[in-house]
Regions:
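Short hydrophobic beta-strand segments
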Residues: 2-14, 236-239
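Conserved PLP-enzyme active-site core in the AAT-like
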Residues: 24, 34-46, 56, 62-69, ...
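ADP-ribose/adenylate-binding Rossmann-like module
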Residues: 78-83, 326-329
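Non-catalytic terminal extensions of PLP-dependent enzymes
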Residues: 4, 12-28, 35-55, 68-76, ...
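Short hydrophobic segments within beta-strands
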Residues: 6-7, 80, 148-150, 239, ...
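Short glycine-rich or small-residue beta-strand-to-loop segments that form or flank ligand, phosphate
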Residues: 212-214, 299-302, 531-536
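Conserved N-terminal alpha-helix of the aminotransferase class I/II PLP-enzyme fold
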Residues: 172-220
Length: 709
């Protein structure tokens, strides 16, 4: 924080300011100079290392003060009246945030001392408790004779390859990787000391009663919540579009799942769970069809969906008749920092009488933290001792302290006006990108990409899905139930019309995503004719423009019918003899024809309309696997057989068949959908779908694991 911004209305600095700058620079500070209010604000938006703002009387007023506060309400601001300035001070125009210094009364050294003390106070204020304690510990440079064995990186420096590794990451990474033996830093497992302060700080930031830092991802956070909330022998309501970590919970614990069935549209975009699925009548009916099921004690709902659809969570919290609800919100840790998400989150609002609400966040996914950083938030009466046992069961006794600090810093970054600005900038950038795609489409001489969104996106808000709208492609939409997040942008490629019907020609989206990947642009998810991109706080204008440029480049190459070798070099290298002289339009039409052959839109609806039959719960199926009571079966032959592993294609990574389930004639469209994915990969090298739980054989066929008859 050595950068200082000086705002002065005169291009030519007076002798006093020149002298002050010289004194500051001798103290190691770098001075940025702005000559008007807009330039001051531009500097502040683009240089987060500015530790203080100095303004002369001729440039400062109350309006500028309010604009600075809106950007960063913690930043120290000084109004200087230089010794060579005779302008009288209008204290009514100064504002309440800034500190006035009449430089006639102080030496340069005194003024610099005031500025430096303010910067130190600013740094102290914005640094959260655990991170502050960790920084202080590293500064002390203590000698240790405990773990970790690299001893602040010293061990790496004794080896050539270790030195390369050390130099790549830098010394503070290793100095801050320390043992749990350091009592002054408390304990993550015991939630004591600075670790406890960090979790209390995070809870305050996210409007929770309790928050827990999880250092091995939301996959683990989900299991911790489930192990606490659902005792063995109980029944749990669970979103069928759940993350596979929740399937792993079902495999670990002997509990009975009853599935809440969401919708999908012709694009394969995951829809929400209809309101009727949450009613007592429908839940009661479900229980009669599941052997051993009792009234559920807990519910798990994915919010938002992978594709960015939020629920009206206030209504679900008030009406769903269970003791606790877990909103798996791994993909939306930013929702507490913009009013557009009010009423659509787990931690929003007050406690719900006689219920405990859990919300899990993948801090690393769309905030700024190291990979695997996650949080559990709780609202309601929690047995903290029992929860702590479930937490310790899944938490390492040697947590990586830099990851703990990054989780806390991610929360700190979102506090106050700075966090609101980060969030607003992301929202504005996402909506601007959406509009740019629509503008290009409107002016295109032939085809162009489209965006999955309402016609009018002028207002930055979560757009409600209405039954009368056609754009979303879902059937039977409930009023005031589902909302689209502006941050998650789904691009559409040609191939499906607005009614969800297949067109004669098409450009399957995996061609585009592979093209983008060859150019260093990685998308989040690719469906048959859709691509999901995320406008997180780390996306800037340069990245957004790079994506737009790459999309335009693909269109140009496609329209010119360039060779596959030119457009998709890595795909070409998968099988040069197959792709020799093949053109991109031929490849696109080939994959599109296979999709048409299987009538994908109808297959999508059918495959997720009837679930497989649960013969045993996932826990029992996994126990049989551990005992070796399973065997291989070709994928196409699995009708009528009990599946041993979960089967899920990537994308989207949502289980289609759970352990212990059987595909019947009624649910056979699920198998047909999987076979279609396999057929595309068999026909076109480089386009194989990764199907977890199905194993590709040398002959190109797939095998799955089934329970022995």
């Amino acid at each position: 924080m050595k950068n200082i911004l000086l705002g002065c209305g005169h291009k030519e600095l007076g002798d006093y300011l020149k002298s002050l700058i010289e004194t500051l620079e001798k103290g190691g500070h770098t001075i940025r100079i702005a000559h008007d209010q807009q330039e001051i604000l531009t500097f502040l938006k683009h240089d987060a290392r500015i530790g203080s703002v100095l303004c002369t009387l001729d440039i400062f007023n109350r309006e500028l003060d309010e604009q600075i506060i809106a950007l960063n309400d913690e930043l120290p601001v000084f109004i200087l009246k230089p010794t060579d300035c005779d302008k009288p001070v209008d204290f009514g125009a100064v504002g309440d945030h800034a500190t006035f210094i009449d430089c006639h009364l102080f030496s340069n050294e005194d003024v610099v001392d005031k500025i430096e003390k303010a910067i130190c106070h600013y740094i102290d204020n914005i640094t959260p408790p655990f991170t502050k304690a960790l920084f202080d510990y590293v500064d002390k440079n203590k000698y240790t004779f405990c773990t970790p064995g690299h001893m602040s990186g010293t061990a790496f420096l004794k080896s050539p390859v270790g030195s390369l590794f050390y130099d790549f990451y830098g010394e503070n990474t290793f100095k801050s990787d320390i043992s749990v033996s350091m009592g002054e830093l408390g304990s993550l497992l015991d939630h004591s000391g600075p670790h406890k302060e960090a979790e209390e700080y995070i809870a305050e930031t996210f409007n929770a009663d309790h928050s827990y830092i999880v250092t091995n991802g939301t996959s683990t956070a989900n299991k911790i919540v489930g192990m606490y909330s659902v005792p063995a022998g109980s029944t749990v309501l669970i979103d069928r579009n759940c993350h596979k970590s929740l399937t792993h919970l079902l495999m670990m614990s002997d509990i009975t799942p009853v599935y809440l069935k969401p919708t999908r549209n012709a694009y394969g975009i995951l829809g929400g769970i209809p309101q009727k699925e949450f009613t007592k009548e429908v839940i009661t009916e479900k229980l009669t069809k599941v052997p051993g099921a009792t009234w559920p004690v807990h519910a798990v709902i994915t919010n938002s969906t992978y594709d960015g659809l939020f629920y009206n969570t206030d209504k679900i919290k008030d009406t769903l008749d269970v003791k606790s609800i877990h909103f798996d919100s791994a993909w939306v840790p930013y929702t507490n920092f913009s009013p557009i998400y009010n009423g659509k989150t787990g931690m929003g609002g007050k406690q719900v009488k006689d219920k405990v609400i859990f919300e899990t966040h993948s801090t690393h996914k769309l905030l700024a933290a190291f990979s695997q950083a996650s949080m559990i938030h709780v609202k309601g009466n929690l047995n903290t001792a029992t929860f702590g046992e479930a937490y310790m069961m899944h938490t390492s006794t040697s947590p990586f302290y830099p990851m703990v600090a990054s989780t806390e810093v991610a929360a700190a970054m979102m506090r106050g006006n700075s966090g609101k600005r980060l969030m607003q900038d992301s929202l504005e950038r996402a909506v601007k990108f959406r509009k740019e795609i629509k503008k290009h489409k409107a002016h295109a001489d032939s085809w162009y990409f489209d965006v999955w969104q309402p016609e009018n996106v002028d207002n930055i808000e979560c757009w409600e899905l209405h039954q009368t709208d056609k754009w979303h492609g879902f059937k039977d939409i409930d009023a005031q139930h589902m909302y689209l997040d502006p941050i998650k942008v789904t691009l559409l490629t040609p191939g499906l019309d607005k009614n969800g019907e297949l067109e004669k020609t098409g450009i399957p989206a995996n061609l585009v995503s592979k093209f983008l990947e060859d150019r260093g642009i990685i998308v989040e998810k690719t469906g048959p004719y859709n691509i999901l991109v995320l406008f997180s706080i780390g996306v800037d204008d340069t990245k957004a423009l790079s994506l737009l440029h790459a999309l335009n480049e693909f269109k140009s190459l496609y329209d010119a019918n360039a060779t596959v070798e030119e457009v998709l070099p890595r795909v070409f290298n998968e099988s040069p003899s197959f792709y020799q002289d093949m053109r991109i339009q031929e490849l696109a039409q080939g994959i599109h024809s296979l999709i048409c052959k299987h009538n994908l839109p109808e297959l999508m609806f059918s495959a997720f309309e009837v679930l497989p039959t649960m013969v045993m719960n996932p826990h029992k199926a996994f126990q049989l696997e551990l005992k070796g009571q399973i065997e291989d079966c070709y994928l196409e032959d699995m009708v009528g057989k009990i599946n041993a592993n979960m089967i899920l294609p990537y994308p989207p990574g949502v289980p289609l068949v759970m352990p212990g389930e059987m595909i019947t004639e009624e649910s056979k469209p699920i198998l047909e959908f999987l076979m279609m994915l396999c057929e595309i990969g068999a026909h076109f090298p480089g386009f194989e779908t990764d199907i977890h739980g199905a194993y590709r054989q040398e002959d190109g066929r797939y095998k799955v694991k089934i329970v022995k008859a």
